[in-house]
Structures are given as structure tokens and as C-alpha cells.
Amino acid sequence: MKKEKAVVVFSGGQDSTTCLFWAIEQFAEVEAVTFNYNQRHKLEIDCAAEIAKELGIKHTVLDMSLLNQLAPNALTRTDMEITHEEGELPSTFVDGRNLLFLSFAAVLAKQVGARHIVTGVCETDFSGYPDCRDVFVKSLNVTLNLSMDYPFVIHTPLMWIDKAETWKLSDELGAFEFVREKTLTCYNGIIGDGCGECPACQLRKAGLDTYLQEREGANN
């Protein structure tokens, strides 16, 4: 894959930034694509742009604001509380988001001569999101190949690892401090370690604490 080109679906968060570093190591050329779907914090787009600029990665932002018209949710509406009731989808779930993001990433990839698409979806910590499942990604991969008659390969480096292992991967890629300090995972728009209270921050911190304990134990 070292001679090929990839497009990374990129939000500027921990997972997609780790995937960006992974792609840089795996492919000869990498581009990043970020989607503006009127998310609560436009800082997410700015953060993604800054990271791409710092890493020297060509960065495209696509307007997907129609998602907010079709599927109101807590990631785009400040008047909706971030909740996750047992047996129900989280209020942060956006119907069709990964379906559309990966589809548009594929269109872009074909236009720029890339057949590899990288996304940070993860089934281990999928938080009740059906479009983060491996079966969905594999199904969409086949559909995209058929729809555009093009040999896309969707890569999911984080699919079967948890947050602690994601931190480990970033460390192995030499990007641990970069990911910790410069990414935006927090639903409240705080870069780095975040607010520590929202579900995204709690998941990130739990993984970080576990990995740091494991790393310390391995070094002793």
C-alpha cells in the first residue's frame, strides 16, 4: 500500500487523528475530508483544519448541512440534551451520517485517484451506533464498488480495539502527545482532555487511564 493513495474521513478527534497518522504510515499519499453538518461546535472543523495543516495533509471540507434538516440530534442542536437511555439509540446518533460520509468520501477519493478510504469507526466502543458496525462497513464497501465500478477498500484500523488500545496505537505511531493535546473529542468543544463530563470525554479518559497504567506496568 506504500505506493497508493488514501482519503481519511477526518473530524479532528482522537480516533480519526489516530487513523490519519496510521494512513500516513501506510500510504504514499494521504488526503483528509471533513464534513460540515452544522455540528454544535464549529471548532471541530477548525481543529481538523489545523491538524491537517500541521501535518502537511491536503484537507477538504464538504457541506453536509442537509443532515441537520433531515435528522435533528444532540450533536447539532443546542436545545437537545445529550442522553443515552438503555435500549435506545443515543441522542448523539445522526441517522445516515456514516453512510453519507463514507459515500461522499468515496466520490472524492475516486476524483483524486485514491481507492483507499480510512475511517475511525469502532465496534468495540460503538456506543450503540449501528453505522459503526463492521457488517455495515463491509456492506457499504461492496455497494460503493458496485455503484461506481471502482475497487474501493474501506479501512477501519480501530474496528476491533477499545479506547485504551487506540491510545496504544497512537503511541506506537509516535503520535501519543499530539493526539492527547491537539484533538477534539469533547461534545462541549474543549480541545485536549476536554470537559471530563460528557460521554465522549468519559470514554476517552477511561481509555487513557487504562493505557497509562498498562504502559507504566510494562516499563517497571
Swiss-Prot record:
- Keywords of this entry: ATP-binding, Ligase, Metal-binding, Nucleotide-binding, Queuosine biosynthesis, Zinc
Record text on cofactor binding: Binds 1 zinc ion per subunit.
Annotated positions binding Zn(2+): C186, C195, C198, C201
Q: Which PANTHER family match?
A: 7-CYANO-7-DEAZAGUANINE SYNTHASE
Annotated pathway: Purine metabolism; 7-cyano-7-deazaguanine biosynthesis
* Alphabetized InterPro entries for the sequence: QueC, Rossmann-like_a/b/a_fold
- Name the gene: queC
What does this protein's UniProt record list under function? Catalyzes the ATP-dependent conversion of 7-carboxy-7-deazaguanine (CDG) to 7-cyano-7-deazaguanine (preQ(0)).
Spell out the family assignment given in the record's similarity comment. Belongs to the QueC family.
At which positions is ATP bound? Answer: F10, S11, G12, G13, Q14, D15, S16, T17, T18, C19, L20
Pfam families according to UniProt: QueC
GO molecular function per UniProt:
ATP binding; ligase activity, forming carbon-nitrogen bonds; zinc ion binding
What is the recorded name of this protein?
7-cyano-7-deazaguanine synthase
Query: What are its cofactors?
Result: Zn(2+)
Spans traversing the lipid bilayer: none
